[in-house]
Amino acid sequence: MLLELSEEHKEHLAFLPQVDSSVVAEFGRIAVEFLRRGANPKIYEGAARKLNVSSDTVQHGVEGLTYLLTESSKLMISELDFQDSVFVLGFSEELNKLLLQLYLDNRKEIRMILSELAPSLPSYHNLEWRLDVQLASRSLRQQIKPAVTIKLHLNQNGDHNTKILQTDPATLLHLVQQLEQALEEMKTNHCRRVVRNIK
């Protein structure tokens, strides 16, 4: 699978052929550092002074490289696909090899950093349910409304917790229909592309 870069990202990466390969390698190190600790304007300013360019140019170059490395790592694209994705940018063969080496050296670490940044959401463990109906009452003059009680067991970071929910059957039926509709929508090509890019 090829990585598709927007025109903006191509513009950001267009700065890389203008600098030495050691500078590109340093930009790669800064890009991984950017993922670990966030942006550091002092590093951009120092590099900009050494290269006699604006700090925005350096920042855009690092951000473009960060995007290239993170998206490639996220999608776990192969060496060949990475080379083909970078080939479209029109860089020299030496720069393409350097970018490939940066990707191969850092992809495991980048995936680890991205997994740490992902939010930890509760996951389903078990479900118990009960239908409550009042069978008889002398004082009851309106129609009997049954209630569905649901006990939901969840796991989050090894901790177990329980949520108790209660609703009427009509609302539960509507909820089931909405969930089934969402599951059907997940089978569309658009949703599959989105999910593939999220991973």
From Swiss-Prot:
PROSITE patterns: COMM. Residues 123-190 form the COMM domain. Keywords: Cytoplasm, Transcription, Transcription regulation, Ubl conjugation pathway. GO terms for cellular component: cytoplasm. It is found in: Cytoplasm. PANTHER family: COMM DOMAIN CONTAINING PROTEIN 2, COMM DOMAIN-CONTAINING PROTEIN 2. Scaffold protein in the commander complex that is essential for endosomal recycling of transmembrane cargos; the commander complex is composed of the CCC subcomplex and the retriever subcomplex. May modulate activity of cullin-RING E3 ubiquitin ligase (CRL) complexes. May down-regulate activation of NF-kappa-B. Belongs to the COMM domain-containing protein 2 family. Component of the commander complex consisting of the CCC subcomplex and the retriever subcomplex. Component of the CCC (COMMD/CCDC22/CCDC93) subcomplex consisting of COMMD1, COMMD2, COMMD3, COMMD4, COMMD5, COMMD6, COMMD7, COMMD8, COMMD9, COMMD10, CCDC22 and CCDC93; within the complex forms a heterodimer with COMMD3. Interacts with RELA, RELB, NFKB1/p105, NFKB2/p100. Interacts with CCDC22, CCDC93, SCNN1B, CUL3, CUL4B, CUL5, CUL7. This is COMM domain-containing protein 2. The gene is COMMD2.
